[in-house]
């Protein structure tokens, strides 16, 4: 459930432009921040403030404006009722499968709003601070779910949800975008900067290495010699390596803009025009910085609450629906939770803006693999819980093949609907694999 911003690669274009920490968003800051066109901007709704402007008291007008922009300023506002319904269902002991479903639906608009609020803060703090916020908090929902699952010692949920988000971005999001983008631009040549794909593929291969070695170590040890401690130590060391790589990735974009892939081009007026996104909204922030920080805290707390419900009821939902936990964690959680982000990537592909699409899909996958996963391992360490990077053979094989297929598809810097179809078919095969897999390992035994 990654945040709905154009993460890592495209968010980091904020870093390339420098930026200050002015209290008020200037026109130059707004221009530079807008260079990272986010998927959330595509599902924004035009706010009609005519009625609010008639309110006599200034303080009340500000409150109503904030409520309208934050709660009603998205096309996903129709899903907000799922948040209180999930709380009520949990409070009054409704079927736990319903609690899971309502929590999953409620997380979709909350994740999008976290992205929106981070974007608003970036307008006020400047592109450097805003870019760092997006680079570290771009997948806040996934991290919250993972940490809560660690607290409940449901390590399989942690690994499935994180791996599912990576596979979803590499195959489903990117595949859908390339397929539909290719069909809608049959008479146009779709191209992108291949350096962006090369950079992210290289980092994903590093993450794959760090996940594969603990699994290999586990298989090479004799059963009577294995106690798990060596694998855990290796996993923690590998986590530090991945974090160093991610930090180097940020620095590379910050200080080596002449070597790194250029930021996605700002779409022309005819490309970014949308009936629900006004020119005024594109000029700068629509709420104040402290209001954005306040709402960001509220949304994060709600995400934590629903994530707790989600983790505690996933096994009950799997039993009720006749599905394996593996299928729910790998397939359902990422698709439903990242629906807004997926839609944004597809829309950019429709508009022949594949660099932005790659920034969303590859950037999110890289951020989860190199930042969220190692942070989760280290947080578990601080909690006195042993978590390793052994994702098991089937999951690791799916990860490796997904990276390989994606890197092959993107190596020449061109796109067509056939490439997207291949990625989608790969995702279908993986989904079918986890759908039919109902082995004891697919149950939560701890």
Swiss-Prot record:
Recorded family membership: Belongs to the Ca(2+):cation antiporter (CaCA) (TC 2.A.19) family. Cation/proton exchanger (CAX) subfamily.
Inducing factors: Slightly induced by Mn(2+), Na(+) and Ni(2+).
Location relative to the cell: Vacuole membrane
Domain of life assignment: Eukaryota
UniProt membrane topology term: Multi-pass membrane protein
Name of the protein this chain belongs to: Vacuolar cation/proton exchanger 4
Ranges annotated as spanning the membrane: 70-90, 97-117, 129-149, 163-183, 197-217, 239-259, 286-306, 320-340, 360-380, 389-409, 417-437
Name of a matching Pfam family: Na_Ca_ex
Broad class of the protein's primary localization: membrane
Zinc is among the record's keywords: no
Region (Cation selection): 138-173, 337-372
GO molecular function, one term: calcium:proton antiporter activity
Practical applications: CAX4 expression in tomato increases calcium content and prolonges shelf life and may serve as an alternative to the application of CaCl(2) used to extend shelf life in numerous agricultural commodities.
Disordered, as annotated region: 1-33
GO biological process, one term: root development
Purpose of the protein: Vacuolar cation/proton exchanger (CAX). Translocates Ca(2+) and other metal ions into vacuoles using the proton gradient formed by H(+)-ATPase and H(+)-pyrophosphatase. Cation selectivity transport in tobacco root tonoplast vesicles is Cd(2+)>Zn(2+)>>Ca(2+)>>>Mn(2+).
Keywords assigned: Antiport, Calcium, Calcium transport, Ion transport, Membrane, Transmembrane, Transmembrane helix, Transport, Vacuole
Cytoplasmic side: 1-69, 118-128, 184-196, 260-285, 341-359, 410-416
Compositional bias (Low complexity): 1-16
CC per GO annotation: plant-type vacuole membrane
Expressed in which tissues: Expressed at low levels in all tissues.
InterPro entries xref list: CaH_exchang, CAX-like, NaCa_Exmemb, NCX_ion-bd_dom_sf
Extracellular membrane side: 91-96, 150-162, 218-238, 307-319, 381-388, 438-446
